[in-house]
Amino acid sequence: MLSSKRRLMRLLPLASLLLTACGLHTQPQNPGQSPTSLQWHQHQQAVEKITHYQTRGAFAWLSERQKVYARFNWQQSAPDRYRLLLTNPLGSTELQLDQQGQVAQIVDNKGKRYVSNDAAQMISQLTGMTIPLSNLRQWMMGLPGEATDYQLDDQYRLREVNFSEEGKRWHVTYLDYHTEQNPQLPANIELQQGDQRIKLKMDSWTIK
């Protein structure tokens, strides 16, 4: 298992390039809108109708003990089926996760397959990364998921989310949105839990 972790974590040099891509934006903190507003519910319903899509961009997982940088490609082909690819700067796949229903399969960069009913735990064991997969898909799309503690910006979109699960408190910050789309979808988000940070920069969204 440790050798698998070393193989997966050998990856992804061009850190400075990806950190630039994932760099923080400073947004003016205007007073947010109410989560009970009609405009938010209309936006939420419009996003929830999107069940087939693809998004790609830059991924960074940062902690005191390790740093991981990658390109990512998330393909959602049904409400309960998706594929997540992490690739290195040369375009080679370092990790592929396929989730269908409760069954998850991971293929590492050596072609070794792992199957589990807990994708997040499997990724943690193989790579050392803690990723809240059960809510990540919702948060990536600008939805609160299971969280009930969240704030909106002045455009009736998510600005912050707070969520506790299994003793871990996640804080999600929305830094930018793709304003050319309707409904508007996130372009840059950051998740933090303790000393761990996950940065996601969605370069594009393709809605099918």
UniProtKB/Swiss-Prot annotation:
InterPro entries: LolA/LolB/LppX, OM_lipoprot_LolB. It comes from the Bacteria. A lipid is attached at residue 22 (S-diacylglycerol cysteine). It is a lipid-anchor. GO terms for cellular component: cell outer membrane. Residues 1-21 form the signal peptide. The keyword tRNA-binding does not apply. The keyword Nucleus does not apply. GO terms for biological process: lipoprotein localization to outer membrane; protein transport. It holds the Pfam family LolB. It is found in: Cell outer membrane. A lipid is attached at residue 22 (N-palmitoyl cysteine). Keywords: Cell outer membrane, Chaperone, Lipoprotein, Membrane, Palmitate, Protein transport, Signal, Transport. Belongs to the LolB family. Plays a critical role in the incorporation of lipoproteins in the outer membrane after they are released by the LolA protein. Monomer. This is Outer-membrane lipoprotein LolB. It comes from Erwinia tasmaniensis (strain DSM 17950 / CFBP 7177 / CIP 109463 / NCPPB 4357 / Et1/99).
